[in-house]
Amino acid sequence: MKTFTFRPKLFSSLKGYSKETFTADLMAGIIVGIVALPLAIAFGIASGVSPEKGIITAIIAGFVISLLGGSKVQIGGPTGAFIVIVYGIIARYGETGLIVATIMAGAILVMLGVFKLGTVIKFIPYPIVVGFTSGIAVTIFTTQIKDLLGLSADSVPADFLPKWQCYFENIGTADPLSVVVGIGSIAIIALWPRISKKIPGSLVAIFAMTLLTYLLRRYAGVTSIETIGDRFQISASLPGGAVPDMSWDVIKGLFPAAVTIAVLGAIESLLSATVADGVTGDKHDSNQELIAQGAANIVTPLFGGIPATGAIARTMTNINNGGKTPVAGLIHAAVLLLILLCLGPLTRHIPMACLAGVLVIVAYNMSEWRTFRALMSNPKADVAVLLVTFLLTVLFDLTVANEVGLVIACLLFMRRVAETTNISVLKDEIDPNADAGISLGAEHLVIPEGVEVYEIDGPFFFGIANKFEEQMVALGNHPQIRIIRMRKVPFIDSTGIHNLTNLCRMSKREGVQIILSGVNPTVHRTLEQARFYDLIGKENICSHIDLALEQARKELAARHPGKR
């Protein structure tokens, strides 16, 4: 296995860097910074923290991801995928617990990158990914109903069903003006692309509805529309760094949540980088990208930030506006920093109903309802994984959905592999020319009397280890020699070795000799390391079936010297 090489895309991108490229990166960075502002505020508030912490996350994480990342155009920051898990951690462990969980997740991501496991993340079953994202979308939508309608409920339950019960019980307290602001924001965001695709609809909606709310408050005496300033104190500065108390009990309690953050971050960042590759024609480095994501999630929470990852929408905005290198991402972070320092206090006038409208659109875009509907016509096993992951995400939390979804997917995968592994009994004759890589030009070989030949087609792992024994029991024969043809066995695991060892010992007690045929180098090495050959003797390991049959005849002759 090759060792990992630390090669951020920024370094290679600066070779031959021109004034024209910088101009393109500058314009793209400014635009992406402006686009990221309302999303950072919305994601911060929806996650249960103050709006400036969402902006701080976009600044610090965006800078680190662009500085160290494995993609030239990836833009990092807070995303909707983390809202549910972050809100749950804060509710249970407080913001200190969130800091610890995020740092742990960052460490996990760094290790995934260092050990070159970036490509493995891409093997997570698609139904699980869709179940996650669709479930998160439903949860985000559900959490925004109170602000969207301006309900005056004192406290809203954390769980899905009680939350909706609370909404229905308090529907009579809805504020008409908040509803107008919320629905108006949704309408602007949905329709604005028909007017202009350069300026994001979310920014237009926030500007328009903030101005409307300000005018209504100042000149009409309206106080029913809640704004950010009514709920949060806005700071126009970066907080100092702080290292949390990471006791062992806290680490143990938060480890499952940290794994969930790491998995979600890895999936979304690599998906975003892959989508970007398809547009730019470039190729990202998955492992380098994971290290950058990990570093960002280690550093950002020390300054009060929340989990961050690569963001598809902001990355595509960067590409569409001419971003060429990671410099655009660095500029985007600088623009957000200037906005925080110079215009931070003005964000207090943004109405909560408007941010709820922004997040409703985010939830809709995340829902992947067309993909969800298409997957419902897939094999039942995939549908089961999809629905279980989706329902657990909505009704419980992402950590449970992550654990159960992956376990179910693994079990179903093992069942499928076990079903594809076939064990057959060869009778009377064998075609020696069927062995891969040889052509003997010989006629079919005759299986001697007293010899059984079994052929295994597929991996010999714990999922099918017992199937071989069941096949022999079903035959009910007691031969003198059993030849196990393993030319189509790509690998064997510990359980397979254990069962094969038990078979050899049982056969030896019954006076039956085991001979292996066609063992490939990988399986040969595994069996040798397990000292399996000491049990049956190296002479009973044959490279091809013709040699195995010859060894069987020698064994029969030795057992019956007077018989020809």
PLM features: residue spans?
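Short, contiguous clusters of charged residues that form electrostatic/catalytic patches at enzyme active sites
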Residues: A28, I186, A190, N466, ...
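Short secondary-structure capping/turn micro-motifs that flank functional sites
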Residues: A334, V523-H524, S543
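Active-site-adjacent beta-strand anchor residues
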Residues: G76, G131, L516-S517, C542
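The feature marks cytosolic C-terminal regulatory regions of anion transporters and related permeases
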Residues: A236, N365-L535, R553-R564
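Short acidic-hydrophobic, aromatic-tinged amphipathic segments that line or gate anion-handling sites
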Residues: L535-Q551
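Generic hydrophobic alpha-helical segments
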Residues: V86, W164-Y167, F468-M472, A548, ...
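Transmembrane helical cores of multi-pass ion-transport proteins
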Residues: M1-P432, G511, R531
